[in-house]
Amino acid sequence: MVAFSALSGVSALSLLLCLVQHAHGVSLKVSTQGGNSSSPILYGFMFEDINHSGDGGIYGQLLQNPGLQGTTPNLTAWAAVGDATIAIDGDSPLTSAIPSTIKLDVADDATGAVGLTNEGYWGIPVDGSEFQSSFWIKGDYSGDITVRLVGNYTGTEYGSATITHTSTADNFTQASVKFPTTKAPDGNVLYELTVDGSVAAGSSLNFGYLTLFGETYKSRENGLKPQLANVLADMKGSFLRFPGGNNLEGNSAENRWKWNETIGDLWDRPGREGTWTYYNTDGLGLHEYFYWCEDLGLVPVLGVWDGFALESGGNTPITGDALTPYIDDVLNELEYILGDTSTTYGAWRAANGQEEPWNLTMVEIGNEDMLGGGCESYAERFTAFYDAIHAAYPDLILIASTSEADCLPESMPEGSWVDYHDYSTPDGLVGQFNYFDNLDRSVPYFIGEYSRWEIDWPNMKGSVSEAVFMIGFERNSDVVKMAAYAPLLQLVNSTQWTPDLIGYTQSPDDIFLSTSYYVQEMFSRNRGDTIKEVTSDSDFGPLYWVASSAGDSYYVKLANYGSETQDLTVSIPGTSTGKLTVLADNDPDAYNSDTQTLVTPSESTVQASNGTFTFSLPAWAVAVLAAN
């Protein structure tokens, strides 16, 4: 859990106010009457496998390159142990999806332990939970097989198990082990699988699709890492958009994310070359995304491929009759998700372990089709997919992948939404504060991706600018229905995009919560169902605000995008006490990272006098007053 430091009485931040310059006081009066309804699912998550956020990130399988997947398989992350060598064997496939396995050639005079190691994704996090490993083996062998987790540089053993297993040269057989572990101090841990060299001497053994899991979130099979899932749960988001993003599109039609190759047993998933420079195992597949939504209480927002791949692949959008097989593929996917067991694809889902249909209400057609040559044909492509999906599933909310009018049909179909993305500078985000004030209320908005960009780690200036942007769309959350910061996760050792919301390494305790994370958490955890009118004697800037209510509770969100302290009076008739949460630093460049945590929120209890709260907001600050 993310713990805020609790302060009673006067906030520690207020003790510094005499040292900094104050602006004139700002008075805010929150109406307790009327207001506009606010979307109940406003804050949530956008996920795609970028920065090893899936494989090597939130997905719980810990071995890198577990099945030698890909058109050009390699031995990345694997090495031999003892008097033996390893090689790729394309003549002993495990399945049609896993055509290559690891061949272990044992020396004629071998003794002791021989086998193979895997270094994980820049390490393996051993957290002290029970671990389990599975693998396939082929070759004439009858004897002990040992799995160990051992320090890469220290040789310290953090857990092990030995089983007796018999295999033959005719077929692959699967073996699995479970074992307790002790917590490792860092991620410098190797997975080691060995056999008895004296028994295997002079022979060859093949190993296929090896896996390693620690404890998973809510003990879900093939599930999520609890360390990262817990941090997301703390945010209390409402939805999950998946599987992308650029990673949905692929670099070509053939390389797109294919739903039916991400289901079933892991060794029946071929994986794919992701669009962010590394291969995706697709162990985190369609089922796993829906279980993620179930376990964190999130509304699923499914992205489907719409005939357009990334421009970097030199692709021309697919249009006309050539779209038909791709539309059919989406309809098959939706039947798999929503169909009962009397349908072909619903029965397939049940055979894969999910008897009941999932609860899917939202589908986004494509990703960022305003970019890279997709705009001109998107109206045609969106309409083709919309018409087919709406005819089969009229209750689904269908979302266009852009809000740019030039890329959309002249008249959007009734009930459809649009998706608005904004990566910008801090001043650029602040400049968008009132963008949503005058929108056509007949077309709901999904802000599918936004953040400050062009910096390594979120800093206070950027995070405050994001808060200003968020206040702007929350004020208009009758029409802005959902919004998600992006990207969400970042393995510090292998990063393709910065900044990101949450960083981590493979050390069990290494999770780095950015200043932007705390802004997202503060805003998401303090939500009303009605946006209230606020009157003031001051204009917006550098102080920005929005107020909402839920029953007798009121939430006032504030952002100070400036270098002067702001003195405030906030009047909410009928309230008497409140909790003030403040994230602030006088240095606009202050940031949290893998080497420092400089900025965290503080909490204080504040009392009202006749319904009026009086306090000061430091420079470069984001605050939430929760009053009742």
From Swiss-Prot:
PANTHER family, alphabetized: ALPHA-L-ARABINOFURANOSIDASE 1
GO biological process: arabinan catabolic process; arabinose metabolic process; L-arabinose metabolic process
Any one annotated GO CC term: extracellular region
The keyword Acetylation is assigned to this record: no
Alphabetized Gene3D superfamilies for the sequence: Glycosidases (3.20.20.80), Golgi alpha-mannosidase II (2.60.40.1180)
Pathway where it operates: Glycan metabolism; L-arabinan degradation
Organism: Aspergillus kawachii (strain NBRC 4308)
Temperature-activity note from the record: Optimum temperature is 55 degrees Celsius.
Activity's dependence on pH: Optimum pH is 4.0. Stable between pH 3.0 and 7.0.
Membrane-spanning intervals of the chain: none
GO MF annotation: an example: alpha-L-arabinofuranosidase activity
Predominant place of localization: secreted
Catalytic activity: Hydrolysis of terminal non-reducing alpha-L-arabinofuranoside residues in alpha-L-arabinosides
UniProt EC number: 3.2.1.55
InterPro entries: Alpha-L-AF_C, ASD1_cat, Glyco_hydro_b, Glycoside_hydrolase_SF, Glycosyl_Hydrolase_51
Function in brief: Alpha-L-arabinofuranosidase involved in the degradation of arabinoxylan, a major component of plant hemicellulose. Acts only on small linear 1,5-alpha-linked L-arabinofuranosyl oligosaccharides.
Keyword Transcription: no
Name of this chain's protein: Alpha-L-arabinofuranosidase A
Cell location: Secreted
Pfam families (alphabetical): Alpha-L-AF_C, ASD1_dom
Key words of the record: Carbohydrate metabolism, Glycoprotein, Glycosidase, Hydrolase, Polysaccharide degradation, Secreted, Signal
Family from the record: Belongs to the glycosyl hydrolase 51 family.
Signal peptide: 1-25
Residues the record marks as carrying a glycan: 36, 51, 74, 152, 171, 260, 359, 493
